[in-house]
UniProtKB/Swiss-Prot annotation:
Enzyme class: hydrolase
GO biological process: base-excision repair
Origin: domain of life: Archaea
Organism: Methanoculleus marisnigri (strain ATCC 35101 / DSM 1498 / JR1)
Protein name per Swiss-Prot or TrEMBL: Putative 3-methyladenine DNA glycosylase
Gene Ontology MF annotations: alkylbase DNA N-glycosylase activity; DNA binding
Amino acid sequence: MTLPAAFYERDTVTVAKDLLGCLLVHREEVTTAGRIVEVEAYLRGDPAAHSYRGTTKRNRVMFGPAGHAYVYRIYGLHTCVNVVTGTEGAGEAVLVRALEPVVGLDLMQARRGTDDPLSLASGPGKLTQALGITMDLNGTSLRDGPLQVRSPANPPELQPENIVQTTRVGITKAADLPLRFYLKGSRYVSRR
């Protein structure tokens, strides 16, 4: 079941933690999906957030309604996918950093050129390549578009002690903020 709009319209840190265990699903000719095991929150006023200096053509989706995909390229190479959160105009989002592959493993392996399930989606660029997420999905609804976030059929009860909170990866601004969250014990995270 896809998540309601109200799920995304909450506090971004709360949404980030609650995304853990959910499924990121890309529906195309062959569906691919993975369980979200690692995320990072980017907040209003956060120097590391794309929204920090205001609205631009590149980041305008971040300022739009919650529950939409903010997809962008980094280094001209890798595509990253974020979940827009909070109130419209806030410029907040959650970066999906890693997935545990669950559906469409063969297609993910072909796209990534590896048979190792642990490295298929263990990073933001890896997971978008594995799921076939492209810039065409920027701004699409995560509730009824081809890219969706769904609650798992039998959601695990995530206790606070099963969520690791630490600093974000690969940034220089606001690098000390503990806004990265991952499932304790998951072998699919990008790094510990």
